[in-house]
């Protein structure tokens, strides 16, 4: 189904791209836009993950450069029966994360330095498990392609405003076309974000909670990231708002309630769903990360059997953060 949705979305974005081309250059502009869109669709399918990671200055790490994070991702990927994804770190103070890649065999998980510094080990595991769930559900292809193509449409629309519309007829249609560009660019980006079903976040929350075995780890992380999104700006995301739907929490602003134009479900609703899941499958009770004991030990065995209700580190949350 993900590939079918991707095809429909690409067709819609191509049509929008052609419309923008027509407004700029008439029939010839639409034809050029069609050719460019076809080439861009092919290029995006194979390269969009690298483009998004580069956009955020993400640096790939391995077991030597980031051993704790790398081993955590490896263990959770094993529990999810996924190939080991590439691991990236973004130098950004806002705690957040996203996954990208056209399929599980070519996937990547990217986390910010803010996420690593501000979350406990347990919360970080919940976030990583959520991103792995997106990979397992093949959401990453749709998220990455829509982000890159929506960004391209916005750039073309901005160029059109500078260019001045269809100069073959400046007596009215050119001006109207320019005004239409002002409306279509943000509207197109909004429609792209709306096209990514918000229900996938609930599905990734549930699957991620089952992967790590502790729904409340993710619930605590969501609350902390949501609060930080109001206080710590993500300037890279502000420059590329079409990528906002890729993150676990909207990096632009917190969403107080579900609404037609939201890129993410309400965090309160997501936490409530995770609380219900915790009551169903078991796991630790909810405690905000600020109450965790800083003197507790770090991770124990990685040989915990798979299954619901048990964490990969022995069942009970440990207070020490993942980075000492």
From Swiss-Prot:
<keyword id="KW-0862">Zinc</keyword>
<feature type="transmembrane region" description="Helical">
    <location>
        <begin position="7"/>
        <end position="24"/>
    </location>
</feature>
<dbReference type="InterPro" id="IPR001915">
    <property type="entry name" value="Peptidase_M48"/>
</dbReference>
<keyword id="KW-1133">Transmembrane helix</keyword>
<feature type="transmembrane region" description="Helical">
    <location>
        <begin position="145"/>
        <end position="165"/>
    </location>
</feature>
<feature type="binding site">
    <location>
        <position position="134"/>
    </location>
    <ligand>
        <name>Zn(2+)</name>
    </ligand>
</feature>
<dbReference type="GO" id="GO:0005886">
    <property type="term" value="C:plasma membrane"/>
</dbReference>
<dbReference type="GO" id="GO:0004222">
    <property type="term" value="F:metalloendopeptidase activity"/>
</dbReference>
<dbReference type="Pfam" id="PF01435">
    <property type="entry name" value="Peptidase_M48"/>
</dbReference>
<feature type="binding site">
    <location>
        <position position="201"/>
    </location>
    <ligand>
        <name>Zn(2+)</name>
    </ligand>
</feature>
<keyword id="KW-0472">Membrane</keyword>
<feature type="transmembrane region" description="Helical">
    <location>
        <begin position="29"/>
        <end position="46"/>
    </location>
</feature>
<feature type="active site">
    <location>
        <position position="131"/>
    </location>
</feature>
<dbReference type="GO" id="GO:0008270">
    <property type="term" value="F:zinc ion binding"/>
</dbReference>
<protein>
    <recommendedName>
        <fullName>Protease HtpX homolog</fullName>
        <ecNumber>3.4.24.-</ecNumber>
    </recommendedName>
</protein>
<dbReference type="InterPro" id="IPR022919">
    <property type="entry name" value="Pept_M48_protease_HtpX"/>
</dbReference>
<comment type="similarity">
    <text>Belongs to the peptidase M48B family.</text>
</comment>
<feature type="region of interest" description="Disordered">
    <location>
        <begin position="288"/>
        <end position="324"/>
    </location>
</feature>
<keyword id="KW-0645">Protease</keyword>
<feature type="transmembrane region" description="Helical">
    <location>
        <begin position="172"/>
        <end position="192"/>
    </location>
</feature>
<keyword id="KW-0378">Hydrolase</keyword>
<keyword id="KW-0479">Metal-binding</keyword>
<dbReference type="InterPro" id="IPR050083">
    <property type="entry name" value="HtpX_protease"/>
</dbReference>
<keyword id="KW-0997">Cell inner membrane</keyword>
<keyword id="KW-1003">Cell membrane</keyword>
<feature type="binding site">
    <location>
        <position position="130"/>
    </location>
    <ligand>
        <name>Zn(2+)</name>
    </ligand>
</feature>
<keyword id="KW-0482">Metalloprotease</keyword>
<dbReference type="GO" id="GO:0006508">
    <property type="term" value="P:proteolysis"/>
</dbReference>
<keyword id="KW-0812">Transmembrane</keyword>
<feature type="compositionally biased region" description="Polar residues">
    <location>
        <begin position="288"/>
        <end position="305"/>
    </location>
</feature>
């Amino acid at each position: 189904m993900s590939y079918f949705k991707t095809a429909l979305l690409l067709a819609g974005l191509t049509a929008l791209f052609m419309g923008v081309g027509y407004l700029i250059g008439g029939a010839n502009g639409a034809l050029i836009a069609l050719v460019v869109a076809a080439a861009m669709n092919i290029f995006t399918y194979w390269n969009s993950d690298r483009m998004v990671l580069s956009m955020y200055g993400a640096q790939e790490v391995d077991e030597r450069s980031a051993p704790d994070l790398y081993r955590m991702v490896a263990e959770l990927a094993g529990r999810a029966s996924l190939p080991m994804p590439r691991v990236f770190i973004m130098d950004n103070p806002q705690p957040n994360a996203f996954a990208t890649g056209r399929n599980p065999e070519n996937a990547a998980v990217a986390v910010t330095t803010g996420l690593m510094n501000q979350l406990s080990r347990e919360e970080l595991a919940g976030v990583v498990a959520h991103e792995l769930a997106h990979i397992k559900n093949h959401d990453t292809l749709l998220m990455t392609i829509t982000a890159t193509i929506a960004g391209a449409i916005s750039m073309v629309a901005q160029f059109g405003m500078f260019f001045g519309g269809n100069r073959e007829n400046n007596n009215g249609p050119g001006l109207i076309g320019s005004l239409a560009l002002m409306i279509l660019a943000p509207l197109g980006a909004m429609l792209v974000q709306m096209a990514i079903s918000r229900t996938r976040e609930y599905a990734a929350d549930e699957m991620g909670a089952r992967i790590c075995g502790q729904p409340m780890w993710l619930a605590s992380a969501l609350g902390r990231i949501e609060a930080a999104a109001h206080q710590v700006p993500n300037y890279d995301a502000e420059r590329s708002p079409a990528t906002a739907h890729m993150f676990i929490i909207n990096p632009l602003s917190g969403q107080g309630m579900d609404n037609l134009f939201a890129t993410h479900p309400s965090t309160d609703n997501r936490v409530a769903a995770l609380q219900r899941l915790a009551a169903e499958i078991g796991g630790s009770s909810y405690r905000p990360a600020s109450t965790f004991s800083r003197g507790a030990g770090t991770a124990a065995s990685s040989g915990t059997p798979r299954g619901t209700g048990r964490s990969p580190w022995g069942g009970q949350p440990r207070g020490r953060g993942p980075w000492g």
